[in-house]
Swiss-Prot record:
It catalyses: UDP-N-acetyl-alpha-D-muramoyl-L-alanyl-gamma-D-glutamyl-meso-2,6-diaminopimeloyl-D-alanyl-D-alanine + di-trans,octa-cis-undecaprenyl phosphate = di-trans,octa-cis-undecaprenyl diphospho-N-acetyl-alpha-D-muramoyl-L-alanyl-D-glutamyl-meso-2,6-diaminopimeloyl-D-alanyl-D-alanine + UMP. Its EC number is 2.7.8.13. One of its GO terms (biological process) is regulation of cell shape. The chain crosses the membrane at residues 19-39, 49-69, 92-112, 116-136, 156-176, 183-203, 215-235, 238-258, 279-299, 345-365. One of its GO terms (cellular component) is plasma membrane. GO terms for molecular function: metal ion binding; phospho-N-acetylmuramoyl-pentapeptide-transferase activity; phosphotransferase activity, for other substituted phosphate groups; UDP-N-acetylmuramoyl-L-alanyl-D-glutamyl-meso-2,6-diaminopimelyl-D-alanyl-D-alanine:undecaprenyl-phosphate transferase activity. HAMAP family: MraY (MF_00038). This is Phospho-N-acetylmuramoyl-pentapeptide-transferase. It comes from the Bacteria.
Amino acid sequence: MANAKSSSLPSWKNPSGKTLLILLWALALALMALLSSWADMPWLSNGKLLIALGFTALVTALIGMAVVPMLVNLKASQVIQSDGPQSHLKKAGTPTMGGIFFVPVAVAIAVVGTQFNPDVIVVGLVTLGYMAIGWVDDWQILKYKSNKGLTPKQKLFLQVAIAVIFCTWLFFYGPTEITDIRIMQFVLPLGFLFWLVATFALVAESNATNLTDGVDGLAAGTGAIAFVGLGLLVAKENPALAFFCCAMAGGCIGFVHHNHNPARVFMGDTGSLALGGSLAAVGIMTGNLWGLLLISGIFLAESLSVIAQVGYYKATKGPDGVGKRLLKMAPIHHHLELSGWTETQIVGSFYLINTLLAIVAMATA
């Protein structure tokens, strides 16, 4: 009934995947246009940020045209959960591990484009580190043809390990005021507590983007908008990392060219863990954890929906060991699917919400 109802909706209420790709481009460029009033930003006036976005998107889309068929030939197909939305069963056979081509491309372009800037190299290594964790997880899933890759403890250990290495580097080579968090016009000195917050942010953000990757074009599109927003926030103080963010945004948009509904490839944990780790690393290095929190509102909502679902189920568990569910299914995008929303309605709505969050983050920075 939900499918029949959605198919009869006007096209503007039930957009196609290609329409969402155009919307994503429009939103990303509109956000960048907000920088036009910042005349003291040479990296904007000479077009470097726009070039980073557009060039990376083009290269990623072109490389994807070669890599996606290779993933199909390698039979790197996503294992679809039988207890998920029934509409997802038709996705069986779609290759995964798409992060293997768009993440390294974006990092490489950012490193070369900033003339091997040390900050970009370090953040790039963090990004590739989280990508490697995701790749191992994806490979295990494909190898054993199940949804069980790395165990939660193994994945958490590796995520924390990379976070600790990154924080150790920042401790010795980062700015002295790195432990201060700016919240609008206020400065909150955290001291040693900052390193615990930073480690948590890296692990939580990478897991949050991973949870968001459940609908065609969702994680990559919201990731692109988040990277553009974060790039705008850090452009004045660290133009090199702004370039990195725009390159990552371009990589995400180039990937959406292949991942919009109906998806020809999924990013897998290879891509989704890298997105969160990358966003968090930039936010931590530039002291923009408050801005990161706002820009990551969609990812935060996805994570909180899972936490609430699990917590409510355990709290209401009866003698028979069965509890009640707060949502029809978690994360929240699956709840919306089971409530009659189409994938493209969810994705389009989340794109718009994430754009508003990015604007709020800039306004309160």
